[in-house]
């Protein structure tokens, strides 16, 4: 019997050569890319020759897209670690709760560095290709695409090509992904290549070939892609084709949803990765409400930039009666248009006390709708335009916290200085002092017992049920950055003990050995664990590990982020 990959390749190529162009279709999918009757021959690259950016064999695992000006980590990043240890850690990375951890993981995976050691006889994917796949998993689509592009022309197996293909399918226009499919016909035996080809045929309006491609996949016993089959059927006129689908969506499914001008079902949307959510948000083929919902979720998890969400908010149009009182409309409306109205309400106010007040009102509504974090990030440029004045100081605490979330420490400090001279709420400096200290601002008053005691007393008055937990969190964070808060210590309430966890034990050992790259990946694993990611002692242990591994600034960023997430 003919071997499966050979049969699949021959069948697909024969299908492409023999199939006639699709007939014109009345109510068929919109043609997003030009149709094609033949496959372009794959580009031939001489192995081992450096030509037009092609990597020689000894260079491909070292490939990266950063330099020191753009945040690259040392070239010895992976020294002392092994592929056997690192590959499972890279395979498990996710966007996570903390932007600071995601950023240091991004820098590690995107930095050019000597690869870790491999055991004799180990057969593993290219390390650079594995790093590109990790970048895609944490939602860094552009970085994944750039790194995969660098190595895909040389890579003999499918890992880099698969990453590149998925990253390209996440773009609003599927044409580059389909060009990549056509340029890599040598991979026709790969199931995902065959699925990608069907997607390209379907979005081009060539449903006859798409159906034939699915039939060939069934004949060759390629694992069924339930969503792909359903989406082709939907485009072919079956209105209920999506009913009952339960599998997870993948990047190559999104162009088909856009071509059908339909949103993924709610259950499927809720399970999308940050990269896929950002893709839906950026794709004009989806309805604006769908795009805003996707952007809000992606922005809240730092999977998308807040400015992209701001642009979507700004693109929503309103009736004159709605424009007359956007805040009232937002309070009554429940959907994405309500958040767009809030944004427009804030933007309509001149920078100054009026905008500060409008932002405070908008945040209250956004918090009730469950999108407060995303809305803050979307409105950050509007907040930065508000000049620090005594007239707007009543909102300084909210504005400082918003600025610190996006690391605008200088602007936040100017608002704090306004509070220090007596403007705004009397307890403002006590509330904000520890946050600015964690942000790296040298505050002489933080050396005074009165400042910390005032902060502790405020927590007891403002939120009694959470006061003790917040005091423990601040004590743990200050201790982790090397500034023990003696005035907050209580002999009857010692610092919480570090949880007994194999993840924490492994992180501690790795940091002690100064294995920078492995420490970063293990820190991400700790803070992805549900029982650890909000635990004060676990967060503090992670900060200490990063500091010991030579990443003190990143540890401090994590401390500030954890404090803000805990409501300090």
Language model regions located:
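Solenoid-like repeat scaffolds
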Residues: 70-80, 109-120, 146-156, 181-190, ...
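Structural motif corresponding to the intra-repeat A-B loop/turn of tetratricopeptide repeats
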Residues: 138, 171-172, 204, 406, ...
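Residue-level signature for tetratricopeptide repeat
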Residues: 134, 163-168, 200-201, 402, ...
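Solenoid-repeat scaffolds in large eukaryotic assemblies
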Residues: 141-144, 174-178, 208-213, 409-415, ...
């Amino acid at each position: 019997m003919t071997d499966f990959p050979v049969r699949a390749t021959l069948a697909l190529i024969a299908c492409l050569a023999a199939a006639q162009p699709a007939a014109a279709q009345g109510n068929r999918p919109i043609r997003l890319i030009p149709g094609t009757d033949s496959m372009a021959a794959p580009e031939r690259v001489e192995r081992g020759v450096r030509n037009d950016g092609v990597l020689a064999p000894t260079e491909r695992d070292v490939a990266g897209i950063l330099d020191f000006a753009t945040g690259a980590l040392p070239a010895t990043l992976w020294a002392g670690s092994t592929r056997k240890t690192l590959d499972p850690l890279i395979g498990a990375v996710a966007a996570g709760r903390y932007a600071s951890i995601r950023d240091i993981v991004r820098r590690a995976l995107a930095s050019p560095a000597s690869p870790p050691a491999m055991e004799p006889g180990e057969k593993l994917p290219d390390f650079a290709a594995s790093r590109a796949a990790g970048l895609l998993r944490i939602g860094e689509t552009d970085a994944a695409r750039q790194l995969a592009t660098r190595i895909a022309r040389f890579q003999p197996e499918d890992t880099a090509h698969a990453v590149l293909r998925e990253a390209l399918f996440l773009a609003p226009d599927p044409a580059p992904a389909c060009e990549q499919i056509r340029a890599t016909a040598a991979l026709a035996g790969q199931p995902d290549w065959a699925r990608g080809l069907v997607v390209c045929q379907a979005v081009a309006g060539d449903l006859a070939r798409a159906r034939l491609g699915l039939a060939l996949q069934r004949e060759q016993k390629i694992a069924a892609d339930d969503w792909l089959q359903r989406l082709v059927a939907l485009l072919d006129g079956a209105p209920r084709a999506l009913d009952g689908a339960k599998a997870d969506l993948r990047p190559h499914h999104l162009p088909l949803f856009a071509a059908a001008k339909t949103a993924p079902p709610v259950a499927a949307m809720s399970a999308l990765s940050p990269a896929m959510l950002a893709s839906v948000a950026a794709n004009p083929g989806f309805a604006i409400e769908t795009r805003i919902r996707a952007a809000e979720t992606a922005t809240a998890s730092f999977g998308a930039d807040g400015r992209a969400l701001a642009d979507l908010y700004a693109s929503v149009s309103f009736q004159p009666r709605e424009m007359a009182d956007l805040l009232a409309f937002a309070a009554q409306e429940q959907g994405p248009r309500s958040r767009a109205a809030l944004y427009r309400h804030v933007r309509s106010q001149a920078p100054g006390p009026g905008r500060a007040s409008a932002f405070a009102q908008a945040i209250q509504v956004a918090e009730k709708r469950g999108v407060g974090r995303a809305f803050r990030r979307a409105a950050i440029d509007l907040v930065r335009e508000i000049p620090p004045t005594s007239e707007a100081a009543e909102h300084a605490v909210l504005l400082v916290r918003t600025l610190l979330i996006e690391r605008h420490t200088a602007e936040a400090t100017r608002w704090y200085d306004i509070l220090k001279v007596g403007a705004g709420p009397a307890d403002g400096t006590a509330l904000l002092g520890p946050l600015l200290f964690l942000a790296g601002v040298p505050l002489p008053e933080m050396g005074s017992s009165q400042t910390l005691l005032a902060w502790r007393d405020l927590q007891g008055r403002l939120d009694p049920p959470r006061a003790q937990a917040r005091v423990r969190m601040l004590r743990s964070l200050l201790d982790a950055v090397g500034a023990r808060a003696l005035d907050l210590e209580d002999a009857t309430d010692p610092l919480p003990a570090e949880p007994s966890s194999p993840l924490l034990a492994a992180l501690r050992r790795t940091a002690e050995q100064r294995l920078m790259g492995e420490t970063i990946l293990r820190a991400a694993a700790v803070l992805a664990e549900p029982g650890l990611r909000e635990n004060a002692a676990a967060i503090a242990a992670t900060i200490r590990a990063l500091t010991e591994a030579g990443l003190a600034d990143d540890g401090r960023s994590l401390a500030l982020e954890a404090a803000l997430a805990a409501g300090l």
